[in-house]
Amino acid sequence: MSLGQAGARFGPRVAGSRLDRPDPTRDGCRALSAAAVAFALVSGAGEAQVRVRTEEAPLTRSAAPGVAVLAPLSEVPVLEAPAIAASILAYSESSAEAAGDASAAGQPYRFADPFEVEATPATHGRWETTADGETAVWRLRAASAGSVSLNLGFTRYVMPPGGRLWVYTVRDGEVEEVVGPFTEADNETHGELWTPILDGAEVVIEAAVPAGRRGELDLRLGSVNRGFRDLPPEGIGSGSHASCHVDVACSDADQHRDQVRSVGLLQVSGTEFCTGVLLNNTSGVRIPLFATARHCLPLRAASIVVYWNYESAQCGDRGGGRLTDFQTGAYDRAEHRNTDFGLLELDDPPRTEHNVYLAGWRRDGALPTSAVGIHHPRAHVKSISFEDDPLSRSLRYGFTFEVADWDKGATARGSSGSPLFDQDKRVVGVLSGGRSACGNDESDYYGRLETAWTGGGTRATRLSDWLDPGGTGATTLGGRDWNGPPESAEPLYAVALRVQDGARSHDVSHAFRDLDG
């Protein structure tokens, strides 16, 4: 359900197991895409920077005579989140690494600080009705002085039929960057909606519903996440820190183009970045299973945003990537502490135009004779790293494969959870920790898929139930295009959700036959 742009550093978030806690609904969100839409055609103003598909502009920007006659934005109430504390702004990830953070390469990359709020259309903002009397419009501005970006967590989202929600920025009185509209189709069982990131220190929230359904809108803003680092982050585009990172746009990655498409930048709880990978399964049914590090998993899976295709336009740019291909929300599937493996299921299929790939995997225990890592170091554009020597097994950070010293490339914060591909281009692990960096000969450690396969012996602590749901016993599996022809007679995209309802539980099956719907 969202978009993005940001960057960051910070220490590791404490990773507790959500699977050990009551989780009455499971989490999820809907997928949207980005297409450049010239709102100038609607308003006569300059072209907006649009990062999601927007079939219509917010009513604030509509020029339809006699319809969207709304008060100027200057009259819309503002919810002021406090400026970010100086202690947070002063934090330096580079100094933490210099001080000997042994797991710097295996930690999330913090870019924002959350501020909890409790704002609803009944308590905040301003209601108006369009001149034709048909549409009720609620608007609220959210701001935090000094923030470089904002993203929002709606801890309650129920949109009535015909309703729409936008979040956008304004510059010089003009709507600039727009997310939405979100609609009734974005109502999920968990009842939440988390947005991607918009640049700047202020955003406008605008909901428009049929006038007769105003009372059916159930919206609660629960978190304003205040960005304190830009994306791309300063310092990685030049200098010694970035000197060894290899753009996937470069010819070095030509033999791994499919694998590159399987990797996404993972935004966690609106405050941190990691990396993850889409994995294939043996059923022949396309299911968006997304693996990352356990320590990257959020307390609420609804809060994740995955950005696809965040890459340099050409080799050597180390920037210029676009965050326009994204989707939000997921369900917890499995996690295993001893391998730091985490598995989510994205609650909507990736859009066709995102052109993603389901990576293959290997669990037969064979030691890779060489390896490739694909990742987003410090939430930067996608990079690729190469190890030409055989790997070894290690017990550091749990049951891991050790990359003793990358022959080309390195990792950093934000690379955490990224996949390790063996010589046959199959995933054998995800990044758990390490000291790897440009300019050193330190190791990285990847939680082993072979060990996480049986994990803790339960459905919630092992991968086998999800990657081999039919129990075929396969030890290796090739990858496949998400957009390829179906391999079974089942629906093109099928998900079985376990929904808890008090003391009762029941299975709900969702089938999505239209990937563009």
PLM regions and their residue ranges:
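Bacterial N-terminal signal peptides
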Residues: 33-42
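Protease-domain processing segments flanking chymotrypsin-fold serine proteases, especially trypsin-like
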Residues: 48-138, 185-280, 480-483
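Extended extracellular/luminal ectodomain segments enriched in beta-structured repeat modules
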Residues: 144-151
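Short, surface-exposed beta-strand/strand-loop-strand elements in extracellular ectodomains
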Residues: 160-173
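Serine endopeptidase catalytic core focused on the charge-relay Asp
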Residues: 197-404, 422
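Catalytic nucleophile loop of clan PA
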Residues: 277-287, 409-431
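C-terminal cap/linker of serine protease catalytic domains
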Residues: 311-343, 347-357, 378, 436-490
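Beta-propeller-forming repeat regions
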Residues: 489-517
